[in-house]
Amino acid sequence: MSDWNEIQRLAADFQRIQLTASAHQLSERNCIEIITKLIAMNKVQVMYTIDGKEYLTPQQLEREIRDELFVHSGRINLVELQQVINVDLTHIDSKVKEMLRGDRSLYLIQGDLIDRDYIDRLAEEINDILQESGQISVSELGKTFNLPTDFLQTNIEKRMGIYIHGQVNPLERGTIYTEAYVARHAAKIRGVFSAITRPTSVSSIIYQYSFPEALLHDILRKLLDEKRLAGSVQGHQSKAIYTPNIYSRTQSNWVLSFFRQNDYIEYDSLTRLDITDPKNYLKKCLNKNVIFLESCVSGQNILGQVQAAIEDVVATPSWVDIMTLLPSPFTTGDASVLLQKHCLKSNKNNTSVQCLCDKFVVSNKFIQNCLQLFDDHMKTKAEKVYFHLLFIDAGKVAAKFASTSSTNPNHSTLTKHDDSNVTGGKKKKGDDSTSSKRKGKGKDRSTPDDLESTRSHIKQNKQDLEFMAIPEIIEVLQREHSNCEDQFLEEIASQLFSPLKRKYQEVAKSVFLASTSSVTSEKRKLHSDAQDKINGLLTNAKLFGKGLQHFSGDAHTTLGKHLLHTLCTEITNIVFSLLISEHIMVDSDPNSLNPETRSSALEKFPNNVKKAASALEKSLSGKDVEQFFDALDVVLGPSICQIMIKKLDKKKERQIIFNHRQSLIEQLNKESKPAMCLHLCTLLLFQRHTQCMIHAPGRCIPQIISFLKQHLTDEQYKTIYEYQQLIIQSIQQSSDKQKPEMSEEPKDSDNSNDNQNIDLQLQEKMTTIKAIALENKKQS
């Protein structure tokens, strides 16, 4: 029976299931696919949570943001909001910006979302603080509530009188006061300033009574505008000075009284009365007929006295010091302003007088009388110094052609302590070839064109000629006007200096023109002397050049440069000295010339002369002696220097070589220093075996000794070579002595003994070295 009942129950359940509608359910995966499809078709807008398990619509996100803002009392940070809602921060930033555009009651401040209710509650809290303290700073509020000062300032001003009961100082918007606080300080300020009787610094009042600075200035301005204080304020803020009216009236009365009695008043007097701007004060206090000077104000009476004195000066050729007419407080600057801007400007005779030293007034007639005192001196002096128009001191040449002067080497003199100057370059004056008489144009080089050029040069260089120095002019004036002040005479002398100079130059020019013929003969003599010197030096230079042909490579280059830097440079200096005298009209000593002065002189030469002289100058810095000789031939030619160069015959050449050898022998016999002794012996041996003169520096002696090896016996060469090595050791040890000691250990006496031994050997072998050179001489 029970089985049947069970069957019936199961049949009933089956029938009920068949009759019941089925409910279809989707899996989570199917849901995700459907939503993804809808998003792709733009049918729905949703955003994922950070864990990706939930979706939010934009509307739901906004509702949750507003709910969280409400829960956090109207202020929440966006980072904190992102953590609560569990949505990416970019979605929250985007939605908040959208909410800010549509809702003006929301603010985004420093990453915090704030609503208007929060600001209202904040204003109520600020009001409580204000009422408790009486004043409050907006910047302090910003630090307290972590909000920008500008944001707080704007919202506080909007709620002033509604939530906040106080006022903002217009001079200091960052501070808020209560009405009671302002009224209390206004009463104190009115009381303090009412008691002041003399000018007082407002900053000192602020410091003494601890008033708020901005509030005090605002209240003080209102009290003065409302006439509740009898006074005035000069300056602004920290430099403001309060002056009561009673003090101002006393000042004004004193100023007017002093001016009426003295017809002037000093600015310093007003400064001592605490008047900060005396000029503007006097413009308001005095009438318009006063004269404002540098240190004081003058009236019309003083001006009238000065004008009367000027009229007397015009009437009689005299002068006046107006400082004697002015009150003692007047300065020289005051006198200058009074004269230049008032007296002389309005005086009808102002063209007849001059103002000197800002205080002297002198008539032009008086100056003309002083000028005539020097007429008798001019012609006499011009006749004595007329040659100064042609020649300038040699010491001025360097200053004329170069900005700085330098020491000039003397290339023809043997310096025993400088190995760059060689005994081989020394010669006697008698060794120079004798000059021959000039022919053709060289005989008389002064032409009418030369005279015109000289006259033109004189016109251009008048500034080099002075009549008298200012102290000398003052002495003459003192003898004639002993009653005049020294300062006045100094100024008169300065006025006379230029007119006297111009007049004297005209007198000197006339004297010069009368003396042209004598000057021309002197120029011919200078040209002749230069020609003789150049011929002698050039002959020696060419003979030395032959000696260079026995060398090659670095030795040839070094010897060539040395010859260019010594004899060739000396020749160039003589040529440039001659050109300077001809074309620049100054007398220049060849020994005073250097590369700088020569380069400066080149710029002043005519173009054709400049080109040839530049080539000559450039050849000195080269290596080729023949290039120098070619450039020299162009400069010495008939178109420029007109120097005749004599050809050297064999007989004269042998005589010069013989004289040069005799000179070396004479020097060798007198020489006692080892290095110079070896130098002279080497030059003698070279000349003996090559029949050529050599002009060599000390650093080339080893190369010459190497060259002589083939001409000497082994014993002679060994002796000379060993002597050379001893000299090198001696020089090295001398250099070591000059180095600073690096240690404090006691010196070993071996070094000093070595030095003595080397010196002793050098002295002992010197006789042998000399004998080698002289024996070779005898064998010849």
UniProtKB/Swiss-Prot annotation:
GO molecular function, one term: UFM1 ligase activity
GO biological process: protein ufmylation; response to endoplasmic reticulum stress; reticulophagy
Biased composition (Polar residues): 403-413
Residue ranges with Basic and acidic residues bias: 443-458, 736-750
Keywords, ordered alphabetically: Transferase, Ubl conjugation pathway
Domain of life: Eukaryota
EC code(s) of this entry: 2.3.2.-
Main function: E3 UFM1-protein ligase that mediates ufmylation of target proteins.
Family: Belongs to the UFL1 family.
The protein's name in its UniProt record: E3 UFM1-protein ligase 1 homolog
Source taxonomy: Eukaryota, Metazoa, Placozoa, Uniplacotomia, Trichoplacea
